């Protein structure tokens, strides 16, 4: 039903990455929950035309625990209470979850389940090497065990349509 709704939209569906990328890029992901909650009501009120709000990724999750000594799940739950009208989106590093090495399948499944229960609506799943087996467990878990959306992603750089580029072409990524 969600895909049907998306296809029917005539407007541009915009994802705001401020709650993840802005402070990750500018402040080494050190934005505290209290600061995010300070602007949450304004986001809910003025961002009501947004498709989604990207508020989680590896660095933001890790930093909230390791440096800010906060529980990232509680942060997500509190933001969800204050911003009930916008889809929440996150980056998920496939078999790495939000960490820096591969985790057992049951850990990835449990993380996804708990994240969805805590308020995550859309999981953008990728693998830095585009190794498809590293995506499978996460993508299957999202599709089969949550009501969340699985947004499968590949990573690339450069101009894939340029005739000057002969290795990483559109054909390369399709195959």
Feature map (PLM): residue ranges:
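N-terminal amphipathic alpha-helix/helix-capping segment at the start of soluble metabolic enzymes
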Residues: 1-21, 26, 76, 81
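Short glycine-rich or small-residue beta-strand-to-loop segments that form or flank ligand, phosphate
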Residues: 19, 23-27, 62, 123-126
């Amino acid at each position: 039903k969600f895909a049907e709704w998306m296809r029917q939209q005539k407007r541009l569906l915009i994802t705001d990455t401020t709650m993840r990328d802005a402070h990750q890029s500018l402040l080494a992901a050190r934005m505290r929950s209290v600061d995010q909650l300070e602007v949450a009501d304004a986001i809910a009120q003025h961002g009501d035309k947004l498709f989604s709000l990207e508020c989680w990724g590896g660095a933001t999750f890790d930093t909230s625990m390791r440096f800010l000594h906060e529980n990232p799940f509680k942060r997500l739950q509190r933001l969800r209470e204050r911003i009930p009208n916008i889809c929440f989106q996150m980056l998920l590093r496939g078999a790495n979850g939000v960490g820096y090495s591969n985790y057992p399948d049951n850990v990835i499944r449990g993380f996804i389940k708990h994240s969805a229960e805590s308020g995550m609506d859309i999981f953008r799943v990728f693998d830095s090497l585009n190794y498809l087996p590293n995506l499978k467990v996460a993508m299957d878990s999202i599709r089969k065990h949550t009501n969340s959306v699985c947004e499968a992603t590949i990573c690339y750089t450069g101009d894939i349509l340029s005739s000057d580029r002969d290795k990483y072409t559109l054909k390369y990524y399709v195959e």
